[in-house]
Regions:
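Generic N-terminal targeting/processing segments that precede catalytic cores or assembly contacts
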Residues: 1-106, 127-217
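A structural signal for small-residue-enriched, beta-sheet-centric alpha/beta enzyme cores
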Residues: 3-6, 13, 19, 214-223, ...
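Ubiquitous "structural anchor" signal
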Residues: 27, 33, 57, 119-124, ...
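Intrinsically disordered, low-complexity terminal tails and inter-domain linkers enriched
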Residues: 93-144, 278-310
Length: 318
């Protein structure tokens, strides 16, 4: 199903995010593990409420694992990740008692005994509590059963202030939920509530990341798996604002108290020349006392210049 938006009286085709690609690939790989056969296509409903159906590519499998890829389609948006393959490798983790342990941990955390009963409640309230606990388990189990990590071409977080903690794969929260929900639905349908490991990789992401803002944000070694709606809207102002907000969060986590932003190429060029000259003067005059502030100012200038004059970071605009 193709979706379009209008920008400046132009009809532009929407695409789908790397997060949607990852979830669809994971869905396809897990389906193979459960059924032993590949589908030609996979489909899911994005958080925006728009269904996406894609072809599966690079389908391979081995003893206890399966892997496939989905090709990113950014629609009419300019995006360095357009056309790259997003892979998902699925493996069942062998732990016979895992589900029982997860179930018991949820019962205990809810104040229930081993039989699922909570002391001191009437039979009717016990029944209601059991229903509530079952709903709680259903909500929590996808996170418990589906482990997600990044492989080659997926960046690693090295700075605070981003969506994921330092050391984690740069797979944002919404894509993680999309992956877990897609996988858990298949497990539940098959009656196979087993621990699954999902590894997302983008071999072309190593080179693509060099054209993105990720290195400045503290995301090293690859691209990010992104998307809050699952859909790429071409020339999205909201995505531009979110890109700037992400960098500001990183600067805030580093203790920066101010940044400088400018409109357009002329403003960026003026800021670059003025801050470098003024910063050098201040540093010389005060024997380096303003060096940290000068570095901060120059970095702020680079941020403004990079984002506002050369185009917004494409892989962050999903």
């Amino acid at each position: 199903m193709e979706t379009f938006v209008y920008k400046d009286h132009k009809k532009l085709r929407c695409g789908y995010t790397t997060g949607t690609c990852a979830a669809l690939a994971a869905q396809g790989a897990v389906r193979f593990l459960l059924t032993g056969s590949w589908r030609e296509t996979e489909e899911l409903m994005t958080p925006k409420g728009i269904p996406v159906r894609v072809a599966l590519e690079e389908k391979t499998s081995g003893d206890g694992w399966a892997e496939c890829a989905v090709r990113k389609d950014a629609g009419d948006d300019y995006d360095v990740t357009n056309g790259i393959l997003v892979y998902a490798r699925a493996e069942f983790v062998k732990d016979k008692n895992f589900y029982e342990k997860v179930q018991m941990s949820h019962l205990e955390s809810s104040g229930f005994g081993a039989a699922g009963e909570k002391p001191g409640l009437s039979p009717e309230n016990q029944k209601q509590q059991k229903k509530a606990n079952a709903a709680h388990q259903k909500e929590a189990l996808p996170e418990s059963l589906v482990r997600i990590d990044g492989g080659i071409g997926i960046g690693r977080i090295t700075k605070s202030g981003l969506d994921q903690p330092v050391g984690a794969a740069a797979i944002n929260s919404v894509p993680r939920k999309m992956i877990r929900d897609a996988v858990y639905e298949l497990l539940e349908e098959a009656g196979e509530l087993r621990l699954v490991s999902i590894t997302i990789s983008v071999p072309a992401g190593v080179e693509a990341a060099k054209k993105t803002f990720n290195p400045r944000l503290g995301i090293q070694g690859g691209i990010s798996i992104l998307g809050t709606s699952g859909i790429v809207e071409p020339m999205s102002e909201e995505a531009l604002v979110e890109t700037i907000r992400t960098h500001l969060n990183v600067l805030k986590a580093e203790g920066r108290k101010w940044v400088i932003a400018v409109p357009g190429n002329m403003g960026a060029g003026f800021l670059e020349r003025y801050l470098v000259e003024h910063g050098k003067f201040c540093t010389d005059a005060h024997q380096g006392s303003n060096a940290a502030d000068t570095d901060a100012a120059v970095e702020a200038e680079q941020m403004a210049y990079g984002e506002l004059s050369t185009g917004t970071e494409p892989s962050l605009l999903e």
